Amino acid sequence: MPDLKKVRAVLIGVGDKEANLIREQLYRCSFPFPKGSVADLGNLRKADAALLIPVLYELLSGKVLPIVIAGKDELARAQFLAYQEAKALVNMAVVDETFRADGVYAPLFKPRHPQLFHFALAGFQVHLTPPEAMGFLTKSHFDLVRLGKSKANIEETEPVLRDADLLTFHLGALKQCEAPGVANPSPSGYFAEEACQLCRYAGMSDKLTSFGLYGFQPEADRDGLTAQTSAQMLWYLLEGLFNRKGDYPASTSGLTEYVVDFRKLNYQLTFWKSAKSGRWWMQVPVATKRKHERHRLVPCSYQDYQLACREELPERLMQALERF
């Protein structure tokens, strides 16, 4: 592996054709990022999780952001498993059109992986998602953001992504007109601009340590459209990365405190606002175990704070309180 001392992000292809087509489009984009800050490690010699996991672990250990480009959706699970050696509890976010209890992520839930602290699913479509899968995620106090809600106010999806240590983005979450090169293209989904915005949000999160783009099927693509869309998404991920504000709250230093008297819950809720970015967090108002401390400040929005001032909380924050 090359010297990565000055590198902040690396591209890793898993599947030559898929990765190379996206690279070709990405290399056509402008590069306003610091010289030598992004490296390309090429492609793994085989699309195999057993090869991908140790590479990701080495990059995570070196505090370099791996960006995985893979055709097989199943490889998204390997991205999570790369965190096993770190022994820390991990928050995982997924952008996909559906979730199936017997799908890609099933081995992480049956039984629940001991390092999976929290899971979030954004952009899913109810008509494609089995009710039992939604019921399972809800009972587990995981975050669910329906496609319609996310598109209605894309900014409200930002806190969900900001809470993730790793994000897996499946191209099936986009409209067919934006990404036809997937296994099951759909007329509904995110527009390319919305997908790019989500990737930028993810890149800006100081908590995010790995990103994966999955599901590209080159043989189904049309005029290179999916490859172009994918490249734009990765470009905006990088733009977010190089615009990080360094306000991930390992401590509350540099944050402004707002205390809300929440009589319905019979205690006060504390919110924190970053002067650097204007972003908000809600503090879990109970004693937490040391292993949970890193997740105690839950990302939220100004709208969430305003609701709390009226003694209301969105379902997502109520679920967060239940997790501790």
Label each region the model flagged:
Residues 1-213, 217-324:
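Conserved alpha-helical scaffold segments that buttress catalytic/binding sites
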